[in-house]
Amino acid sequence: MERIKELRNLMSQSRTREILTKTTVDHMAIIKKYTSGRQEKNPSLRMKWMMAMKYPITADKRITEMVPERNEQGQTLWSKMSDAGSDRVMVSPLAVTWWNRNGPVTSTVHYPKVYKTYFDKVERLKHGTFGPVHFRNQVKIRRRVDINPGHADLSAKEAQDVIMEVVFPNEVGARILTSESQLTITKEKKEELQDCKISPLMVAYMLERELVRKTRFLPVAGGTSSVYIEVLHLTQGTCWEQMYTPGGEVRNDDVDQSLIIAARNIVRRAAVSADPLASLLEMCHSTLIGGTRMVDILRQNPTEEQAVDICKAAMGLRISSSFSFGGFTFKRTSGSSIKREEEVLTGNLQTLKIRVHEGYEEFTMVGKRATAILRKATRRLVQLIVSGRDEQSIAEAIIVAMVFSQEDCMIKAVRGDLNFVNRANQRLNPMHQLLRHFQKDAKVLFQNWGIEHIDNVMGMVGVLPDMTPSTEMSMRGIRVSKMGVDEYSSTERVVVSIDRFLRVRDQRGNVLLSPEEVSETQGTERLTITYSSSMMWEINGPESVLVNTYQWIIRNWETVKIQWSQNPTMLYNKMEFEPFQSLVPKAIRGQYSGFVRTLFQQMRDVLGTFDTTQIIKLLPFAAAPPKQSRMQFSSLTVNVRGSGMRILVRGNSPVFNYNKTTKRLTILGKDAGTLIEDPDESTSGVESAVLRGFLILGKEDRRYGPALSINELSNLAKGEKANVLIGQGDVVLVMKRKRDSSILTDSQTATKRIRMAIN
């Protein structure tokens, strides 16, 4: 108070006012504060002060030739004084107005191309719809989000090379454009920006926006795809939200969404195959997403999702060090534990062997619709603070945390036996058994957990076993909070290992991910996903399996035919026949297989019985492990279109129909391709026609390598010997004649010699 009086007193003297307003500031500390460094210390003041001057702008000397000294109103546009410390002229803001109205107009053709991201944004906003504003508490959590829609997914280094090549093609420096996307973009941009007058630096900045994903760690309550993030400031405040539907999709969001769907489908499918890891890699390498190889997208795309991370781990890429359980991402924020095997008894007296985490640890749990902070000790939940969109989401988080805590009362709450299996019909591990059990029904778990009195803490309420909020009581250690828990912000990636059952571990051996963690949610991909692998044939149902299996045989008929005669077991074990087995009734698979294999053996043994269509038709049935029986079949059943349909062993059926005249094969009425039979299979004079120009030397001789198909014979040099597969599926040794003159006699001798060679 005294000081204020003193100051008032001082100010009343006119001299004080004069000193404060007129004299220069000469205190070194103040001068230092405002003049050190390039950073402007008070930008808004500086701007106001500058604009109050007559000539606040400096411009290149050429301006004096292009802009008149005075405008129509007679106001001076530039000063004859040159700027101190540079050879530029001092210019009035009025000169800018004059230039905008009367200055030269250049071609605008390049603007939409260079500023593409801005033009696209305007279009999206124009077609977007803004709904009503709602006032309510916003539970925002910080998530790592993509902030520039419409970008390619190049790494910073790749983008830098592209930009240098497009904008500064003549600059020195090694630039290696290797990836498909780099080359395409460079070619496209060079064409678009020919004769572009916009400053190269600006073009470079804009290109960077188009090529590289930029992420920020922002508080978000709603959608996280980039077209929502660009309007974040319009759609959510501290206590309000505005509904918004974007006016267009962008490719980067589509890629992220389709990648997740493809990865989930692939992991689910691989998990049920004989060798999950090998199958997963085979599928990732043969899948295209929107025309781009899935493995290329995986290398560049930072999306973190359980299935995507399993695929990345399989490819040897680094992934985030957080782990997944029950659909929540767990990140340990403090503490440590050691793991020990322990046997526990459920409420049903079933013994479970669980890996117990001994020690005090704290975790953040982040899910799609709920987040939490979990503090736990050895087999004891100390505290869980959870927040979520609704009661259901909060309950999900509580169940996961209770199971994760490994508390005894949770294990004792199990009623009935635990025998959940995964898609491959293998028992789940004990922790996932418990999780599935309580996800189905958590009533007993919540009832047995225990209740406690609670203190009144700002922003926190208790929650009772029936999920109703309360300010007096709560389930032991559990509170519901208004504030969300931020996602783990670090973008650090760690080296991981993956076993053949797709369990991903960090270098300490902790399991980070497993197929059980992959969401079962089905979605429709926004970009076309092309799975070339036979394992994914079943994704479109039984009919697709049937058609694809036969198409595969027809496409590879030349090599299939050779294997059929030489190495049938290897052929029967081909993975392309695996999906087909699911169509054959389980009880009879083995008998069918035994029957077809016997039939094929007779074809190999008996001259003149080789039948292309019949082999193609029956081959998929021979792939199942055969049962020896004397059973004969005139038709084989496949389960398609919701019922059993028959394939006739001899003759056509709606399922498998071969038209001899058109040589077309139709499966279930769908065209499956052209089938070229061996020339005139009905007569046994086949070979003579085919083997003109070759001398038949006798039976197959393994020293001359695997049997060639008839088409491959033409590559032999004169005098060269080879084994060849002839019409009936028999193999003989031939030599290409040294002289052409004797070709005619071949036809007559061939038939005799073949009979001798085979018998």
UniProtKB/Swiss-Prot annotation:
<keyword id="KW-1097">Inhibition of host MAVS by virus</keyword>
<comment type="similarity">
    <text>Belongs to the influenza viruses PB2 family.</text>
</comment>
<keyword id="KW-1195">Viral transcription</keyword>
<keyword id="KW-0946">Virion</keyword>
<dbReference type="Pfam" id="PF00604">
    <property type="entry name" value="Flu_PB2_5th"/>
</dbReference>
<feature type="short sequence motif" description="Nuclear localization signal">
    <location>
        <begin position="736"/>
        <end position="739"/>
    </location>
</feature>
<dbReference type="GO" id="GO:0039523">
    <property type="term" value="P:symbiont-mediated suppression of host mRNA transcription via inhibition of RNA polymerase II activity"/>
</dbReference>
<dbReference type="InterPro" id="IPR048298">
    <property type="entry name" value="Flu_PB2_CAP-bd"/>
</dbReference>
<keyword id="KW-0945">Host-virus interaction</keyword>
<keyword id="KW-1104">Inhibition of host RNA polymerase II by virus</keyword>
<keyword id="KW-1090">Inhibition of host innate immune response by virus</keyword>
<dbReference type="InterPro" id="IPR049114">
    <property type="entry name" value="Flu_PB2_6th"/>
</dbReference>
<keyword id="KW-1157">Cap snatching</keyword>
<dbReference type="InterPro" id="IPR037258">
    <property type="entry name" value="PDB2_C"/>
</dbReference>
<dbReference type="InterPro" id="IPR049110">
    <property type="entry name" value="Flu_PB2_2nd"/>
</dbReference>
<dbReference type="Pfam" id="PF20947">
    <property type="entry name" value="Flu_PB2_1st"/>
</dbReference>
<keyword id="KW-0506">mRNA capping</keyword>
<dbReference type="GO" id="GO:0039694">
    <property type="term" value="P:viral RNA genome replication"/>
</dbReference>
<dbReference type="Pfam" id="PF20950">
    <property type="entry name" value="Flu_PB2_4th"/>
</dbReference>
<dbReference type="GO" id="GO:0039545">
    <property type="term" value="P:symbiont-mediated suppression of host cytoplasmic pattern recognition receptor signaling pathway via inhibition of MAVS activity"/>
</dbReference>
<dbReference type="Pfam" id="PF20951">
    <property type="entry name" value="Flu_PB2_6th"/>
</dbReference>
<dbReference type="Pfam" id="PF20952">
    <property type="entry name" value="Flu_PB2_7th"/>
</dbReference>
<comment type="function">
    <text>Plays an essential role in transcription initiation and cap-stealing mechanism, in which cellular capped pre-mRNAs are used to generate primers for viral transcription. Recognizes and binds the 7-methylguanosine-containing cap of the target pre-RNA which is subsequently cleaved after 10-13 nucleotides by the viral protein PA. Plays a role in the initiation of the viral genome replication and modulates the activity of the ribonucleoprotein (RNP) complex.</text>
</comment>
<protein>
    <recommendedName>
        <fullName>Polymerase basic protein 2</fullName>
    </recommendedName>
</protein>
<dbReference type="GO" id="GO:0044423">
    <property type="term" value="C:virion component"/>
</dbReference>
<dbReference type="GO" id="GO:0042025">
    <property type="term" value="C:host cell nucleus"/>
</dbReference>
<dbReference type="GO" id="GO:0003968">
    <property type="term" value="F:RNA-directed RNA polymerase activity"/>
</dbReference>
<comment type="subunit">
    <text>Influenza RNA polymerase is composed of three subunits: PB1, PB2 and PA. Interacts (via N-terminus) with PB1 (via C-terminus). Interacts with nucleoprotein NP (via N-terminus). Interacts (via N-terminus) with host MAVS (via N-terminus); this interaction inhibits host innate immune response.</text>
</comment>
<keyword id="KW-1113">Inhibition of host RLR pathway by virus</keyword>
<dbReference type="GO" id="GO:0006370">
    <property type="term" value="P:7-methylguanosine mRNA capping"/>
</dbReference>
<dbReference type="InterPro" id="IPR049106">
    <property type="entry name" value="Flu_PB2_N"/>
</dbReference>
<keyword id="KW-0899">Viral immunoevasion</keyword>
<keyword id="KW-0507">mRNA processing</keyword>
<dbReference type="InterPro" id="IPR001591">
    <property type="entry name" value="INV_PB2"/>
</dbReference>
<keyword id="KW-1048">Host nucleus</keyword>
<dbReference type="Pfam" id="PF20948">
    <property type="entry name" value="Flu_PB2_2nd"/>
</dbReference>
<keyword id="KW-1190">Host gene expression shutoff by virus</keyword>
<dbReference type="GO" id="GO:0039657">
    <property type="term" value="P:symbiont-mediated suppression of host gene expression"/>
</dbReference>
<dbReference type="GO" id="GO:0003723">
    <property type="term" value="F:RNA binding"/>
</dbReference>
<dbReference type="GO" id="GO:0033650">
    <property type="term" value="C:host cell mitochondrion"/>
</dbReference>
<keyword id="KW-1045">Host mitochondrion</keyword>
<dbReference type="InterPro" id="IPR049113">
    <property type="entry name" value="PB2_helical"/>
</dbReference>
